[in-house]
Amino acid sequence: MQETGVHNGAYGTDKFGLKNLKGVYWNFGAPQLYEHALKNGEAVLSSDGALVADTGVFTGRSPKDKFTVRDATTENTMWWGGNQSITAEQFEALYQDFLKHAEGMTLFAQDLYGGADPTFRIKTRVYTELAWHSLFIRTLLRRPERAELENFVPELTLIDLPSFRADPKRHGCRSENVVAIDFARKIVLIGGTQYAGEMKKSVFTTLNYYLPEKGVLPMHCSANVGPNGDTAIFFGLSGTGKTTLSADPNRTLIGDDEHGWGKDGVFNFEGGCYAKCIKLSSENEPEIYAASTRFGAVLENVVLGELDRKPDFDDGSKTENTRSAYPLESIPNASLTGRAGQPKNVVMLAADAFGVMPPIAKLTPAQAMYHFLSGYTAKVAGTERGVTEPTPEFSTCFGSPFLPRDPSVYGNMLRELIAKHNVDCWLVNTGWTGGIYGTGHRMPIKVTRALLTAALDGSLRNVEFRTDPYFGFAVPTALPGVPSEILDPVKTWADKAAFDTTARKLVGMFQKNFAKFEAQVDAEVRAAAPDVKMAVE
Protein backbone atom coordinates (compact mmCIF):
# COMPACT_ATOMS: atom_id res chain seq x y z
CA MET A 1 0.00 0.00 0.00
CA GLN A 2 1.30 3.42 -0.96
CA GLU A 3 0.89 6.15 1.67
CA THR A 4 1.60 9.83 1.11
CA GLY A 5 1.32 12.75 3.52
CA VAL A 6 1.72 13.41 7.23
CA HIS A 7 0.05 11.22 9.83
CA ASN A 8 0.64 9.21 13.00
CA GLY A 9 2.36 6.09 11.66
CA ALA A 10 1.55 4.21 14.84
CA TYR A 11 -2.18 4.75 14.31
CA GLY A 12 -2.94 4.01 10.68
CA THR A 13 -5.69 2.45 8.60
CA ASP A 14 -5.24 -0.96 10.23
CA LYS A 15 -6.60 0.41 13.52
CA PHE A 16 -9.95 0.93 11.79
CA GLY A 17 -9.86 -2.47 10.10
CA LEU A 18 -9.11 -1.19 6.61
CA LYS A 19 -6.97 -3.60 4.61
CA ASN A 20 -5.82 -4.32 1.06
CA LEU A 21 -6.05 -0.65 0.15
CA LYS A 22 -4.27 0.55 -2.97
CA GLY A 23 -3.15 3.70 -1.20
CA VAL A 24 -3.94 6.50 1.26
CA TYR A 25 -3.39 10.22 0.82
CA TRP A 26 -3.01 11.66 4.33
CA ASN A 27 -4.05 15.22 5.21
CA PHE A 28 -3.62 16.70 1.75
CA GLY A 29 -4.26 20.43 1.37
CA ALA A 30 -6.38 22.26 -1.19
CA PRO A 31 -3.89 22.32 -4.11
CA GLN A 32 -3.27 18.56 -3.99
CA LEU A 33 -6.96 17.75 -3.53
CA TYR A 34 -7.87 20.03 -6.45
CA GLU A 35 -5.41 18.10 -8.62
CA HIS A 36 -6.88 14.72 -7.70
CA ALA A 37 -10.51 15.85 -7.98
CA LEU A 38 -9.91 17.29 -11.44
CA LYS A 39 -7.77 14.36 -12.62
CA ASN A 40 -10.40 11.86 -11.41
CA GLY A 41 -13.25 13.76 -13.09
CA GLU A 42 -15.00 14.36 -9.76
CA ALA A 43 -15.29 18.13 -10.21
CA VAL A 44 -14.59 21.03 -12.56
CA LEU A 45 -13.01 24.44 -12.11
CA SER A 46 -14.93 27.71 -12.15
CA SER A 47 -13.48 30.82 -13.78
CA ASP A 48 -12.88 32.21 -10.28
CA GLY A 49 -10.89 29.18 -9.10
CA ALA A 50 -13.59 27.42 -7.06
CA LEU A 51 -13.94 23.63 -7.25
CA VAL A 52 -17.43 22.77 -8.51
CA ALA A 53 -18.96 19.34 -7.91
CA ASP A 54 -22.28 17.76 -8.80
CA THR A 55 -23.74 15.55 -6.05
CA GLY A 56 -25.96 13.53 -8.38
CA VAL A 57 -29.26 12.14 -7.12
CA PHE A 58 -28.90 13.47 -3.59
CA THR A 59 -28.81 17.27 -3.48
CA GLY A 60 -29.53 17.46 0.24
CA ARG A 61 -29.44 15.40 3.39
CA SER A 62 -31.58 12.27 3.58
CA PRO A 63 -32.79 12.14 7.21
CA LYS A 64 -34.95 9.06 6.59
CA ASP A 65 -31.77 7.13 5.80
CA LYS A 66 -29.99 8.02 9.05
CA PHE A 67 -29.75 5.33 11.76
CA THR A 68 -28.23 4.97 15.23
CA VAL A 69 -27.20 1.76 16.97
CA ARG A 70 -29.62 0.93 19.76
CA ASP A 71 -27.63 -0.76 22.53
CA ALA A 72 -26.79 -0.44 26.23
CA THR A 73 -25.09 2.92 25.57
CA THR A 74 -28.03 4.54 23.81
CA GLU A 75 -31.13 2.70 25.06
CA ASN A 76 -31.93 5.26 27.78
CA THR A 77 -30.01 8.28 26.50
CA MET A 78 -31.26 8.64 22.90
CA TRP A 79 -34.41 10.46 21.83
CA TRP A 80 -35.96 7.50 20.07
CA GLY A 81 -39.02 9.55 19.19
CA GLY A 82 -36.87 11.45 16.71
CA ASN A 83 -34.21 8.91 15.74
CA GLN A 84 -34.27 5.60 13.87
CA SER A 85 -32.48 2.57 15.26
CA ILE A 86 -30.53 -0.42 13.97
CA THR A 87 -29.10 -3.26 16.02
CA ALA A 88 -25.42 -3.66 16.88
CA GLU A 89 -25.40 -6.78 14.69
CA GLN A 90 -26.81 -4.89 11.69
CA PHE A 91 -24.24 -2.13 12.16
CA GLU A 92 -21.41 -4.68 12.39
CA ALA A 93 -22.55 -6.27 9.12
CA LEU A 94 -22.66 -2.82 7.51
CA TYR A 95 -19.22 -1.96 8.91
CA GLN A 96 -17.66 -5.16 7.59
CA ASP A 97 -19.25 -4.59 4.19
CA PHE A 98 -17.84 -1.04 4.12
CA LEU A 99 -14.36 -2.40 4.85
CA LYS A 100 -14.75 -5.03 2.12
CA HIS A 101 -15.99 -2.42 -0.37
CA ALA A 102 -12.97 -0.20 0.36
CA GLU A 103 -10.46 -2.92 -0.56
CA GLY A 104 -8.45 -1.97 -3.62
CA MET A 105 -9.37 1.71 -3.28
CA THR A 106 -7.12 4.72 -2.83
CA LEU A 107 -8.65 6.70 0.03
CA PHE A 108 -8.18 10.27 1.19
CA ALA A 109 -7.77 10.69 4.96
CA GLN A 110 -8.09 13.85 7.06
CA ASP A 111 -7.30 14.21 10.76
CA LEU A 112 -9.35 17.09 12.12
CA TYR A 113 -10.92 18.58 15.22
CA GLY A 114 -14.64 18.92 15.78
CA GLY A 115 -14.64 21.96 18.09
CA ALA A 116 -12.41 25.00 18.71
CA ASP A 117 -12.23 24.53 22.48
CA PRO A 118 -9.39 22.09 23.31
CA THR A 119 -11.28 20.90 26.40
CA PHE A 120 -14.36 19.80 24.49
CA ARG A 121 -13.27 19.13 20.90
CA ILE A 122 -13.41 15.64 19.41
CA LYS A 123 -10.48 14.29 17.40
CA THR A 124 -12.00 13.13 14.12
CA ARG A 125 -10.51 11.02 11.34
CA VAL A 126 -12.40 11.08 8.03
CA TYR A 127 -11.75 8.58 5.21
CA THR A 128 -13.29 9.55 1.88
CA GLU A 129 -13.50 7.89 -1.51
CA LEU A 130 -13.60 11.26 -3.29
CA ALA A 131 -10.92 13.95 -3.25
CA TRP A 132 -13.45 16.78 -3.24
CA HIS A 133 -15.16 15.27 -0.19
CA SER A 134 -11.77 15.31 1.54
CA LEU A 135 -11.37 19.00 0.71
CA PHE A 136 -14.92 19.69 1.87
CA ILE A 137 -14.49 18.15 5.31
CA ARG A 138 -11.00 19.64 5.67
CA THR A 139 -12.60 23.03 4.99
CA LEU A 140 -15.54 22.54 7.34
CA LEU A 141 -13.82 21.09 10.41
CA ARG A 142 -10.80 22.52 12.23
CA ARG A 143 -7.31 21.73 10.99
CA PRO A 144 -4.54 20.69 13.42
CA GLU A 145 -0.97 21.91 13.16
CA ARG A 146 1.53 19.60 11.45
CA ALA A 147 3.13 18.60 14.77
CA GLU A 148 -0.29 17.59 16.10
CA LEU A 149 -0.88 15.34 13.08
CA GLU A 150 2.20 13.28 13.88
CA ASN A 151 0.69 12.21 17.22
CA PHE A 152 -3.00 12.28 16.24
CA VAL A 153 -5.15 9.47 17.68
CA PRO A 154 -8.79 9.77 16.58
CA GLU A 155 -11.71 9.54 18.99
CA LEU A 156 -14.30 9.51 16.18
CA THR A 157 -13.81 7.82 12.80
CA LEU A 158 -15.99 8.49 9.77
CA ILE A 159 -15.81 6.67 6.44
CA ASP A 160 -17.60 8.08 3.42
CA LEU A 161 -18.02 5.82 0.36
CA PRO A 162 -20.55 7.18 -2.17
CA SER A 163 -20.14 4.10 -4.41
CA PHE A 164 -21.25 1.77 -1.60
CA ARG A 165 -24.82 0.44 -1.77
CA ALA A 166 -26.51 -0.70 1.42
CA ASP A 167 -28.77 -3.76 1.57
CA PRO A 168 -31.90 -2.90 3.61
CA LYS A 169 -32.54 -6.54 4.56
CA ARG A 170 -28.99 -7.20 5.69
CA HIS A 171 -28.25 -3.80 7.24
CA GLY A 172 -31.63 -2.83 8.70
CA CYS A 173 -31.80 0.41 6.75
CA ARG A 174 -34.39 1.84 4.35
CA SER A 175 -32.57 2.07 1.02
CA GLU A 176 -29.18 1.77 -0.66
CA ASN A 177 -28.28 5.17 0.81
CA VAL A 178 -27.26 5.07 4.49
CA VAL A 179 -25.83 7.13 7.34
CA ALA A 180 -25.20 4.95 10.40
CA ILE A 181 -23.76 6.01 13.77
CA ASP A 182 -22.46 3.81 16.57
CA PHE A 183 -21.96 6.07 19.60
CA ALA A 184 -20.39 3.32 21.71
CA ARG A 185 -17.63 2.69 19.16
CA LYS A 186 -17.58 6.27 17.85
CA ILE A 187 -17.89 5.21 14.21
CA VAL A 188 -19.91 6.84 11.41
CA LEU A 189 -20.59 5.07 8.10
CA ILE A 190 -21.88 7.08 5.11
CA GLY A 191 -22.68 5.31 1.85
CA GLY A 192 -24.64 5.81 -1.35
CA THR A 193 -24.70 9.62 -1.36
CA GLN A 194 -22.34 12.25 -2.71
CA TYR A 195 -23.98 15.07 -0.74
CA ALA A 196 -21.05 16.28 1.38
CA GLY A 197 -23.22 17.88 4.06
CA GLU A 198 -23.92 14.41 5.49
CA MET A 199 -20.33 14.30 6.79
CA LYS A 200 -20.39 17.57 8.68
CA LYS A 201 -23.81 16.90 10.16
CA SER A 202 -22.70 13.46 11.36
CA VAL A 203 -19.89 15.07 13.35
CA PHE A 204 -22.41 17.63 14.65
CA THR A 205 -24.79 14.85 15.73
CA THR A 206 -21.93 13.17 17.61
CA LEU A 207 -21.07 16.39 19.45
CA ASN A 208 -24.78 16.87 20.20
CA TYR A 209 -24.73 13.50 21.94
CA TYR A 210 -21.58 13.87 24.04
CA LEU A 211 -21.37 17.56 24.99
CA PRO A 212 -24.46 17.87 27.24
CA GLU A 213 -22.81 15.32 29.57
CA LYS A 214 -19.92 17.79 29.86
CA GLY A 215 -22.11 20.81 30.64
CA VAL A 216 -21.93 22.24 27.11
CA LEU A 217 -25.04 23.13 25.09
CA PRO A 218 -24.49 22.17 21.41
CA MET A 219 -26.40 24.49 19.08
CA HIS A 220 -27.43 24.67 15.43
CA CYS A 221 -26.69 28.36 15.16
CA SER A 222 -24.37 31.04 13.84
CA ALA A 223 -22.49 33.41 16.14
CA ASN A 224 -20.61 36.68 16.00
CA VAL A 225 -19.08 39.16 18.41
CA GLY A 226 -19.14 42.97 18.48
CA PRO A 227 -16.24 45.37 18.97
CA ASN A 228 -16.99 45.51 22.71
CA GLY A 229 -16.85 41.73 23.10
CA ASP A 230 -20.64 41.25 23.06
CA THR A 231 -21.38 37.81 21.64
CA ALA A 232 -24.61 37.09 19.74
CA ILE A 233 -26.09 33.71 18.80
CA PHE A 234 -28.42 33.24 15.82
CA PHE A 235 -30.71 30.20 15.76
CA GLY A 236 -32.65 29.38 12.62
CA LEU A 237 -33.56 26.67 10.15
CA SER A 238 -32.20 26.51 6.61
CA GLY A 239 -33.03 29.59 4.58
CA THR A 240 -33.86 31.88 7.52
CA GLY A 241 -30.67 33.95 7.28
CA LYS A 242 -28.27 32.45 9.85
CA THR A 243 -25.27 32.68 7.56
CA THR A 244 -26.25 35.96 5.90
CA LEU A 245 -27.07 37.89 9.07
CA SER A 246 -24.10 36.69 11.08
CA ALA A 247 -21.72 37.84 8.30
CA ASP A 248 -21.81 41.46 9.47
CA PRO A 249 -18.90 43.74 8.45
CA ASN A 250 -19.13 45.51 11.82
CA ARG A 251 -18.88 42.33 13.88
CA THR A 252 -16.41 39.43 14.03
CA LEU A 253 -17.80 36.13 12.74
CA ILE A 254 -17.31 33.17 15.09
CA GLY A 255 -19.05 30.68 12.80
CA ASP A 256 -22.12 30.18 10.64
CA ASP A 257 -23.71 26.89 11.70
CA GLU A 258 -22.59 24.87 14.75
CA HIS A 259 -21.45 26.04 18.19
CA GLY A 260 -21.16 25.01 21.81
CA TRP A 261 -22.06 27.18 24.82
CA GLY A 262 -20.37 26.34 28.09
CA LYS A 263 -18.81 27.81 31.21
CA ASP A 264 -16.19 29.78 29.25
CA GLY A 265 -18.52 31.12 26.57
CA VAL A 266 -19.22 30.13 22.97
CA PHE A 267 -16.99 28.13 20.62
CA ASN A 268 -17.32 27.11 16.99
CA PHE A 269 -17.37 23.41 16.14
CA GLU A 270 -16.05 24.17 12.66
CA GLY A 271 -13.30 25.90 10.71
CA GLY A 272 -15.36 26.81 7.67
CA CYS A 273 -18.79 27.87 6.44
CA TYR A 274 -21.42 26.04 4.39
CA ALA A 275 -23.65 28.69 2.86
CA LYS A 276 -26.73 28.30 0.72
CA CYS A 277 -25.85 30.19 -2.44
CA ILE A 278 -29.01 30.27 -4.54
CA LYS A 279 -29.48 33.91 -5.65
CA LEU A 280 -26.12 34.81 -4.10
CA SER A 281 -24.99 38.28 -5.21
CA SER A 282 -22.09 40.60 -4.50
CA GLU A 283 -24.58 43.38 -3.75
CA ASN A 284 -26.57 41.64 -1.00
CA GLU A 285 -23.91 39.33 0.48
CA PRO A 286 -20.51 40.67 -0.56
CA GLU A 287 -18.43 38.66 1.92
CA ILE A 288 -20.05 35.30 1.12
CA TYR A 289 -19.92 36.06 -2.61
CA ALA A 290 -16.21 36.85 -2.43
CA ALA A 291 -15.52 33.71 -0.37
CA SER A 292 -17.43 31.57 -2.89
CA THR A 293 -15.66 32.89 -5.98
CA ARG A 294 -12.04 32.10 -5.20
CA PHE A 295 -9.55 29.27 -4.93
CA GLY A 296 -10.33 26.95 -2.01
CA ALA A 297 -14.12 27.26 -2.20
CA VAL A 298 -16.14 24.13 -2.93
CA LEU A 299 -19.42 24.70 -4.78
CA GLU A 300 -22.11 22.01 -4.80
CA ASN A 301 -24.59 21.77 -7.68
CA VAL A 302 -23.91 25.31 -8.89
CA VAL A 303 -24.46 25.72 -12.64
CA LEU A 304 -21.51 27.15 -14.59
CA GLY A 305 -21.62 29.10 -17.84
CA GLU A 306 -20.99 26.69 -20.71
CA LEU A 307 -18.21 28.78 -22.23
CA ASP A 308 -16.99 31.17 -19.54
CA ARG A 309 -17.35 28.76 -16.58
CA LYS A 310 -18.68 31.56 -14.38
CA PRO A 311 -20.99 30.42 -11.56
CA ASP A 312 -24.64 31.28 -12.20
CA PHE A 313 -25.93 31.55 -8.65
CA ASP A 314 -29.44 32.38 -9.91
CA ASP A 315 -29.78 29.02 -11.67
CA GLY A 316 -31.59 26.51 -9.47
CA SER A 317 -32.16 23.94 -12.22
CA LYS A 318 -30.17 21.24 -10.37
CA THR A 319 -31.53 22.17 -6.95
CA GLU A 320 -32.54 25.20 -4.90
CA ASN A 321 -30.11 23.85 -2.29
CA THR A 322 -26.93 24.98 -4.03
CA ARG A 323 -24.09 25.30 -1.53
CA SER A 324 -20.73 26.94 -1.04
CA ALA A 325 -18.14 25.62 1.42
CA TYR A 326 -15.22 27.90 2.24
CA PRO A 327 -12.72 28.32 5.07
CA LEU A 328 -13.40 30.90 7.77
CA GLU A 329 -10.22 32.69 6.71
CA SER A 330 -12.05 33.71 3.52
CA ILE A 331 -14.27 36.03 5.58
CA PRO A 332 -12.23 39.18 6.28
CA ASN A 333 -13.48 39.67 9.84
CA ALA A 334 -13.78 36.06 10.97
CA SER A 335 -12.37 34.86 14.28
CA LEU A 336 -9.63 32.33 13.65
CA THR A 337 -9.73 31.16 17.29
CA GLY A 338 -13.42 30.27 16.92
CA ARG A 339 -14.05 31.30 20.53
CA ALA A 340 -15.86 34.16 22.27
CA GLY A 341 -17.22 35.09 25.68
CA GLN A 342 -20.66 34.63 27.18
CA PRO A 343 -23.50 35.79 24.87
CA LYS A 344 -25.29 39.07 25.48
CA ASN A 345 -28.00 38.32 22.90
CA VAL A 346 -29.76 35.25 21.51
CA VAL A 347 -31.66 35.70 18.23
CA MET A 348 -34.18 33.17 16.90
CA LEU A 349 -34.82 33.55 13.17
CA ALA A 350 -38.09 32.53 11.52
CA ALA A 351 -39.03 32.96 7.86
CA ASP A 352 -42.76 33.40 8.48
CA ALA A 353 -44.44 32.92 5.10
CA PHE A 354 -47.84 33.61 6.71
CA GLY A 355 -46.79 37.26 7.14
CA VAL A 356 -48.25 37.71 10.63
CA MET A 357 -45.16 37.77 12.85
CA PRO A 358 -43.51 41.13 13.58
CA PRO A 359 -40.01 41.78 12.20
CA ILE A 360 -38.62 41.65 15.75
CA ALA A 361 -39.91 40.79 19.22
CA LYS A 362 -38.32 40.52 22.67
CA LEU A 363 -38.72 37.19 24.48
CA THR A 364 -38.74 36.31 28.16
CA PRO A 365 -36.59 33.28 29.17
CA ALA A 366 -39.74 31.12 29.24
CA GLN A 367 -40.82 32.38 25.80
CA ALA A 368 -37.29 31.74 24.53
CA MET A 369 -37.48 28.11 25.68
CA TYR A 370 -40.95 27.78 24.11
CA HIS A 371 -39.80 29.10 20.73
CA PHE A 372 -36.53 27.13 20.92
CA LEU A 373 -38.45 23.89 21.45
CA SER A 374 -40.90 24.91 18.70
CA GLY A 375 -38.20 25.78 16.14
CA TYR A 376 -40.62 27.46 13.73
CA THR A 377 -40.19 28.59 10.16
CA ALA A 378 -42.39 28.19 7.08
CA LYS A 379 -41.61 26.69 3.69
CA VAL A 380 -43.09 27.74 0.39
CA ALA A 381 -43.58 24.84 -2.02
CA GLY A 382 -44.45 24.77 -5.70
CA THR A 383 -43.36 28.33 -6.45
CA GLU A 384 -43.20 27.60 -10.16
CA ARG A 385 -46.91 26.70 -10.19
CA GLY A 386 -48.04 30.01 -8.74
CA VAL A 387 -49.35 30.91 -5.32
CA THR A 388 -49.58 28.03 -2.88
CA GLU A 389 -50.31 27.73 0.82
CA PRO A 390 -47.20 28.08 2.99
CA THR A 391 -46.26 24.98 4.97
CA PRO A 392 -45.25 25.49 8.60
CA GLU A 393 -42.08 23.70 9.63
CA PHE A 394 -41.38 23.01 13.29
CA SER A 395 -37.92 21.58 13.87
CA THR A 396 -37.31 21.43 17.60
CA CYS A 397 -34.21 23.27 18.87
CA PHE A 398 -33.85 24.52 15.27
CA GLY A 399 -32.17 21.24 14.42
CA SER A 400 -34.40 18.21 14.98
CA PRO A 401 -32.52 15.90 12.53
CA PHE A 402 -29.31 16.35 14.53
CA LEU A 403 -30.64 15.79 18.07
CA PRO A 404 -29.67 12.46 19.59
CA ARG A 405 -31.06 13.37 23.02
CA ASP A 406 -34.54 14.45 24.08
CA PRO A 407 -35.21 18.09 23.05
CA SER A 408 -35.99 19.02 26.67
CA VAL A 409 -32.32 18.33 27.53
CA TYR A 410 -31.22 21.13 25.19
CA GLY A 411 -34.20 23.37 26.01
CA ASN A 412 -33.55 23.29 29.75
CA MET A 413 -29.85 23.96 29.22
CA LEU A 414 -30.66 27.00 27.07
CA ARG A 415 -33.10 28.41 29.61
CA GLU A 416 -30.59 27.97 32.45
CA LEU A 417 -27.79 29.62 30.47
CA ILE A 418 -30.03 32.55 29.47
CA ALA A 419 -31.03 33.14 33.09
CA LYS A 420 -27.51 32.67 34.48
CA HIS A 421 -25.90 35.15 32.09
CA ASN A 422 -28.84 37.62 31.86
CA VAL A 423 -29.08 37.24 28.08
CA ASP A 424 -31.53 39.28 25.97
CA CYS A 425 -33.57 37.07 23.61
CA TRP A 426 -35.15 38.15 20.34
CA LEU A 427 -37.40 36.56 17.72
CA VAL A 428 -36.76 37.95 14.23
CA ASN A 429 -39.05 37.35 11.24
CA THR A 430 -37.01 37.24 8.02
CA GLY A 431 -40.05 36.02 6.08
CA TRP A 432 -43.04 37.89 4.70
CA THR A 433 -44.79 41.17 5.49
CA GLY A 434 -47.86 42.84 3.99
CA GLY A 435 -49.66 39.56 3.42
CA ILE A 436 -49.22 35.85 3.14
CA TYR A 437 -46.65 34.49 0.68
CA GLY A 438 -47.98 35.31 -2.79
CA THR A 439 -49.64 38.60 -1.83
CA GLY A 440 -47.12 40.10 0.59
CA HIS A 441 -43.40 40.57 0.05
CA ARG A 442 -40.19 39.39 1.69
CA MET A 443 -39.02 41.40 4.69
CA PRO A 444 -36.37 43.82 3.36
CA ILE A 445 -32.94 42.66 4.52
CA LYS A 446 -32.01 46.29 5.26
CA VAL A 447 -34.88 46.49 7.76
CA THR A 448 -33.83 43.20 9.37
CA ARG A 449 -30.22 44.37 9.63
CA ALA A 450 -31.27 47.74 11.13
CA LEU A 451 -33.43 46.01 13.76
CA LEU A 452 -30.71 43.50 14.58
CA THR A 453 -28.13 46.25 14.95
CA ALA A 454 -30.44 48.08 17.35
CA ALA A 455 -31.00 44.89 19.35
CA LEU A 456 -27.31 43.99 19.53
CA ASP A 457 -26.01 47.48 20.37
CA GLY A 458 -28.59 47.94 23.14
CA SER A 459 -30.70 50.62 21.41
CA LEU A 460 -33.87 48.51 21.62
CA ARG A 461 -33.69 48.45 25.41
CA ASN A 462 -34.68 52.13 25.47
CA VAL A 463 -37.76 52.06 23.21
CA GLU A 464 -41.44 51.56 23.96
CA PHE A 465 -42.87 48.07 23.53
CA ARG A 466 -46.39 46.72 23.01
CA THR A 467 -47.60 43.20 23.74
CA ASP A 468 -48.48 41.27 20.60
CA PRO A 469 -52.13 40.16 20.97
CA TYR A 470 -51.56 36.79 19.29
CA PHE A 471 -48.11 35.71 20.41
CA GLY A 472 -47.75 37.54 23.72
CA PHE A 473 -44.22 38.76 23.17
CA ALA A 474 -42.99 42.37 23.39
CA VAL A 475 -42.76 44.29 20.10
CA PRO A 476 -41.09 47.72 19.70
CA THR A 477 -43.52 50.44 18.60
CA ALA A 478 -40.96 52.72 16.93
CA LEU A 479 -37.31 52.81 15.97
CA PRO A 480 -35.42 55.57 14.15
CA GLY A 481 -34.78 54.67 10.52
CA VAL A 482 -37.42 51.92 10.40
CA PRO A 483 -40.96 52.59 9.06
CA SER A 484 -43.26 52.29 12.10
CA GLU A 485 -46.00 50.43 10.20
CA ILE A 486 -43.67 47.52 9.39
CA LEU A 487 -43.18 46.92 13.14
CA ASP A 488 -46.90 46.08 13.49
CA PRO A 489 -47.70 43.43 10.88
CA VAL A 490 -51.47 44.04 10.85
CA LYS A 491 -50.82 47.58 9.57
CA THR A 492 -49.03 46.16 6.51
CA TRP A 493 -52.05 44.09 5.46
CA ALA A 494 -54.79 45.65 3.32
CA ASP A 495 -57.31 43.04 4.53
CA LYS A 496 -57.35 43.24 8.36
CA ALA A 497 -59.89 40.41 8.72
CA ALA A 498 -57.68 38.13 6.63
CA PHE A 499 -54.75 39.02 8.90
CA ASP A 500 -56.73 38.03 12.00
CA THR A 501 -57.80 34.72 10.44
CA THR A 502 -54.24 33.93 9.35
CA ALA A 503 -52.70 34.89 12.70
CA ARG A 504 -55.19 32.72 14.60
CA LYS A 505 -54.45 29.85 12.22
CA LEU A 506 -50.70 30.10 12.90
CA VAL A 507 -51.29 30.31 16.66
CA GLY A 508 -53.27 27.07 16.41
CA MET A 509 -50.39 25.44 14.53
CA PHE A 510 -47.98 26.44 17.31
CA GLN A 511 -50.30 25.01 19.96
CA LYS A 512 -50.82 21.74 18.10
CA ASN A 513 -47.08 21.28 17.56
CA PHE A 514 -46.15 22.06 21.18
CA ALA A 515 -48.62 19.57 22.68
CA LYS A 516 -45.92 16.87 22.61
CA PHE A 517 -43.65 18.96 24.85
CA GLU A 518 -46.20 20.12 27.43
CA ALA A 519 -45.54 17.27 29.86
CA GLN A 520 -41.80 18.00 29.79
CA VAL A 521 -41.91 21.73 30.60
CA ASP A 522 -43.10 23.71 33.62
CA ALA A 523 -46.16 25.96 33.92
CA GLU A 524 -44.19 29.11 33.08
CA VAL A 525 -43.11 27.72 29.70
CA ARG A 526 -46.62 26.40 28.97
CA ALA A 527 -47.95 29.89 29.74
CA ALA A 528 -45.51 31.37 27.21
CA ALA A 529 -47.45 29.79 24.34
CA PRO A 530 -49.29 31.96 21.80
CA ASP A 531 -52.98 32.09 22.63
CA VAL A 532 -55.88 33.28 20.49
CA LYS A 533 -57.61 34.43 23.68
CA MET A 534 -55.04 37.23 23.79
CA ALA A 535 -56.17 38.55 20.41
CA VAL A 536 -58.54 41.46 20.25
CA GLU A 537 -61.93 40.12 19.26
From Swiss-Prot:
GO terms for molecular function: ATP binding; metal ion binding; phosphoenolpyruvate carboxykinase (ATP) activity. Keywords: ATP-binding, Cytoplasm, Decarboxylase, Gluconeogenesis, Lyase, Manganese, Metal-binding, Nucleotide-binding. GO terms for cellular component: cytosol. Mn(2+) binds at K201, H220, D257. One of its GO terms (biological process) is gluconeogenesis. Its cofactor is Mn(2+). InterPro entries: PEP_carboxykinase_ATP, PEP_carboxykinase_C, PEP_carboxykinase_N, PEPCK_ATP_CS. Its main location: cytoplasm. Involved in the gluconeogenesis. Catalyzes the conversion of oxaloacetate (OAA) to phosphoenolpyruvate (PEP) through direct phosphoryl transfer between the nucleoside triphosphate and OAA. Belongs to the phosphoenolpyruvate carboxykinase (ATP) family. This is Phosphoenolpyruvate carboxykinase (ATP). The lineage of its organism: Bacteria, Pseudomonadati, Pseudomonadota, Alphaproteobacteria, Hyphomicrobiales.
